[in-house]
């Protein structure tokens, strides 16, 4: 039986492209259709014009962590071929470092190195601190952890060789995950950590708070604002609602047979 630390080939399911809208087409997420804002700002108009400019072309936009500012920024439009190259990057999901999950449920580091409520943004901060090229995908989620959206793609190798920025990572992804786990332990997740995530104007009035955990349901109590756990969506709303108590049906009593006695 191999030890947990010796397992490396686990990218088959973890590398799936799954976003929140794919779980439920009616769910409004940062990549699903947005609710039209009542106040139209100039920057919103500029953003819309920029999207129209590349509509119908063979180019897409990706988000990345600016190593100088630490903020999530959008790249210049890239071609489908370039996007295919990006998909060869190593993938890190928050559930890899979740101490409340078993290996079968998505954890990939030893339990003593795992933490409570890991967030993709904190993982990206760790990767940036080690000087690695990374891409932040805030709308992607692990199939077993759809309530905690976000993942990081990290460039370690090209054509089987370590890239210059990853020259110290001869241990590959296992070594990287160990260092990321150490960073997460030094930077525990709090409600204030949610303010560091990039959000659009649709989230301006949403309160940062912990959410109640549901018994028997694997979930975190600190999740990004665009998590379906915070939206009261039908997909997850039922886990917070108390089951309706059905009134017992009234038993039907058969009528008594009445006899009339006639005396002669």
Curated annotation (Swiss-Prot):
Gene3D superfamilies documented for this protein: Signal recognition particle, SRP19-like subunit (3.30.56.30)
The answer to keyword Ribonucleoprotein applying to this record is: yes
InterPro entries noted in UniProt: Signal_recog_particle_SRP19 (IPR002778), SRP19-like_sf (IPR036521)
**One GO BP annotation here?**
SRP-dependent cotranslational protein targeting to membrane, signal sequence recognition
Which SUPFAM superfamilies does the record associate with it?
A: SRP19 (SSF69695)
Q: Which GO terms describe its cellular component?
A: signal recognition particle, endoplasmic reticulum targeting
Any one Pfam family match given in the protein's UniProt record, by short name: SRP19
Compartments where found: Cytoplasm
- The reply to whether Cytoplasm figures as a keyword in the UniProt entry is yes
Recorded GO molecular functions are: 7S RNA binding
- Highest taxon of source: Eukaryota
Keywords (A to Z) from UniProt: Cytoplasm, Ribonucleoprotein, RNA-binding, Signal recognition particle
Question: What is its biological role?
Answer: Signal-recognition-particle assembly has a crucial role in targeting secretory proteins to the rough endoplasmic reticulum membrane. It must be involved intimately in the translocation of a wide variety of protein substrates.
> Quaternary structure?
Fungal signal recognition particle consists of a 7S RNA molecule (scR1) and at least six protein subunits: SRP72, SRP68, SRP54, SEC65, SRP21 and SRP14.
Q: Which PANTHER family match?
A: SIGNAL RECOGNITION PARTICLE 19 KD PROTEIN, SIGNAL RECOGNITION PARTICLE 19 KDA PROTEIN
- Give the similarity note: Belongs to the SRP19 family.
Name of the featured protein: Signal recognition particle SEC65 subunit
What organism does the record attribute this protein to? Candida glabrata (strain ATCC 2001 / BCRC 20586 / JCM 3761 / NBRC 0622 / NRRL Y-65 / CBS 138) (Yeast)
């Amino acid at each position: 039986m191999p030890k947990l630390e010796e397992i490396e080939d686990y990218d088959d399911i973890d590398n799936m492209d799954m976003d929140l809208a794919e779980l439920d087409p009616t769910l409004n997420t940062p990549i699903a259709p947005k609710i039209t804002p009542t106040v139209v700002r100039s920057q919103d108009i500029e953003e819309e014009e920029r999207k129209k400019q590349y509509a119908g072309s063979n180019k897409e936009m990706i988000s990345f962590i600016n190593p100088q500012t630490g903020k999530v920024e959008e790249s210049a439009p890239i071609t489908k071929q370039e996007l295919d190259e990006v998909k060869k990057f190593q993938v890190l999901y928050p559930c890899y470092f979740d101490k409340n999950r078993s290996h079968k449920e998505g954890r990939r580091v030893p339990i003593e190195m795992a933490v409570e409520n890991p967030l993709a943004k904190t993982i990206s901060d760790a990767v940036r601190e080690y000087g690695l090229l990374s891409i932040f995908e805030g709308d992607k989620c692990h199939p077993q952890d759809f309530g905690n959206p976000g993942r990081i793609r990290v460039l370690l190798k090209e054509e089987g060789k370590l890239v210059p920025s990853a020259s110290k990572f001869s241990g590959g992804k296992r070594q990287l995950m160990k260092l990321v786990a150490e960073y997460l332990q030094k930077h525990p997740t709090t409600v204030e950590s949610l303010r560091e995530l990039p959000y659009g104007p649709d989230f301006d009035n949403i309160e940062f708070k912990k959410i109640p955990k549901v018994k028997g349901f694997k979930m975190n109590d600190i999740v990004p604002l665009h998590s379906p756990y915070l939206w009261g969506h039908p997909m997850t709303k039922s886990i917070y609602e108390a089951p309706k108590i059905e009134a017992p049906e009234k038993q039907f009593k058969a009528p008594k047979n009445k006899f009339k006695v006639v005396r002669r």
